[in-house]
Curated annotation (Swiss-Prot):
<feature type="binding site">
    <location>
        <position position="67"/>
    </location>
    <ligand>
        <name>Mg(2+) 2</name>
    </ligand>
</feature>
<keyword id="KW-0479">Metal-binding</keyword>
<dbReference type="InterPro" id="IPR002176">
    <property type="entry name" value="X-over_junc_endoDNase_RuvC"/>
</dbReference>
<comment type="subunit">
    <text>Homodimer which binds Holliday junction (HJ) DNA. The HJ becomes 2-fold symmetrical on binding to RuvC with unstacked arms; it has a different conformation from HJ DNA in complex with RuvA. In the full resolvosome a probable DNA-RuvA(4)-RuvB(12)-RuvC(2) complex forms which resolves the HJ.</text>
</comment>
<feature type="binding site">
    <location>
        <position position="139"/>
    </location>
    <ligand>
        <name>Mg(2+) 1</name>
    </ligand>
</feature>
<dbReference type="GO" id="GO:0003677">
    <property type="term" value="F:DNA binding"/>
</dbReference>
<comment type="function">
    <text>The RuvA-RuvB-RuvC complex processes Holliday junction (HJ) DNA during genetic recombination and DNA repair. Endonuclease that resolves HJ intermediates. Cleaves cruciform DNA by making single-stranded nicks across the HJ at symmetrical positions within the homologous arms, yielding a 5'-phosphate and a 3'-hydroxyl group; requires a central core of homology in the junction. The consensus cleavage sequence is 5'-(A/T)TT(C/G)-3'. Cleavage occurs on the 3'-side of the TT dinucleotide at the point of strand exchange.</text>
</comment>
<keyword id="KW-0233">DNA recombination</keyword>
<dbReference type="InterPro" id="IPR012337">
    <property type="entry name" value="RNaseH-like_sf"/>
</dbReference>
<dbReference type="GO" id="GO:0005737">
    <property type="term" value="C:cytoplasm"/>
</dbReference>
<feature type="active site">
    <location>
        <position position="67"/>
    </location>
</feature>
<feature type="active site">
    <location>
        <position position="7"/>
    </location>
</feature>
<dbReference type="GO" id="GO:0006281">
    <property type="term" value="P:DNA repair"/>
</dbReference>
<dbReference type="GO" id="GO:0008821">
    <property type="term" value="F:crossover junction DNA endonuclease activity"/>
</dbReference>
<dbReference type="Pfam" id="PF02075">
    <property type="entry name" value="RuvC"/>
</dbReference>
<feature type="active site">
    <location>
        <position position="139"/>
    </location>
</feature>
<keyword id="KW-0963">Cytoplasm</keyword>
Length: 154
């Protein structure tokens, strides 16, 4: 199964693509969709949707795993939630099934406890994907963690 993991954001959307065929997980791709701070929020959303469409066309994921947020308090958080909405809409347009996970569930699935530190989750991602170097940037590593959680929780 090919899984696209997504760590939503307005400035940077982390993505990670894994393949789970053959009984092992392996990383196919990871990176970020970057938007320019000088652009309007609307233009930034267009960039996210356009780049995500390209990723979906290139990798043809059978499942998308998206980090889910629960608290919306600041204007920055609202922008992230709006970007997440663009991600969800784009996935729906391509008929990619979606599973969502809050950060604590991702940490629990990878590190064994919901309050794990970022480096503990990164270590688990590297172990599960048999990586010698940590995926960079952090948003891409987070997206791989989300993708792995999608696989473990299926």
């Amino acid at each position: 199964m090919r899984i696209l993991g997504i760590d939503p954001g307005l400035a940077r959307v982390g993505y990670g693509v894994i393949d789970t065929s053959g009984g092992q997980q392996r990383m196919l791709d990871c990176g970020i969709i970057r938007t320019e701070p000088g652009y309007s929020e609307g233009d930034r959303m267009v960039v996210i949707a356009s780049d995500l469409r390209q990723l979906i066309r290139a990798w043809r994921p059978e499942l998308a795993a998206v980090e889910k947020f629960f608290f919306y308090r600041s204007s920055t958080t609202i922008s992230v939630v709006q970007a997440r909405g663009v991600v969800m809409m784009t996935l729906a347009r391509f008929k990619v099934p979606v599973v969502e996970f809050p950060p604590m569930q991702i940490k629990l699935a990878l590190a064994g406890f919901g309050h794990a530190e970022k480096d503990e989750v990164l270590e688990a991602v590297m172990r599960e994907l048999n990586l010698t170097d940590p995926p960079r940037p952090d948003d891409a590593a987070d997206a791989l963690a989300v993708a792995l959680t999608g696989w473990f929780q299926r």
